[in-house]
């Protein structure tokens, strides 16, 4: 039987990375296995992934050398960042650059980079309908990820740029979930009128 190809998954104990890691581990016929990358290999979530068969390895997006070690011998990687941990476009770009540099160094065959579109392509900085933030962004957590795309392309890393939809878990993480009203009923409100919201569960 052919040896399974290793996919290094950043954010493996988070929503997006965790969903992917479990999907791979639960599909015995996929031909892939998971190297779960996390800053804390002793966390409960890391231990759960290990029980499912993942190789759990310590790595930090702020530490290029740790990423190089973690990517060594892997076929590919799933790269994702968590903007809300620092609220810094500069850090977002620096983290993506470290991932791309490590991927090139390790000779990965393929990378999936979880990114967003650049909102400035649709709402220019000159458009006053939305404020310009930090001097150069309309939606910093979108625009910075889009800027970071070039970290992979300029290094010649074979990359799929994944633009996923909003995921339902965000309603819980960001306090937008159902609220109990005076009558005891749970209400869920999202002021969007008749507009549609594409969404999925991160686990899917």
Residue ranges and their predicted role:
Residues 2-48, 62-72, 76-93, 101-112, ...:
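Oxidoreductase cofactor-interface core, primarily capturing Rossmann-like NAD(P)-dependent enzymes
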Residues 53-54, 159:
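Short, conserved active-site loop motifs that form the nucleotide-linked donor/cofactor pocket
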Residues 59:
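Cofactor-binding loops of NAD(P)H-dependent oxidoreductases
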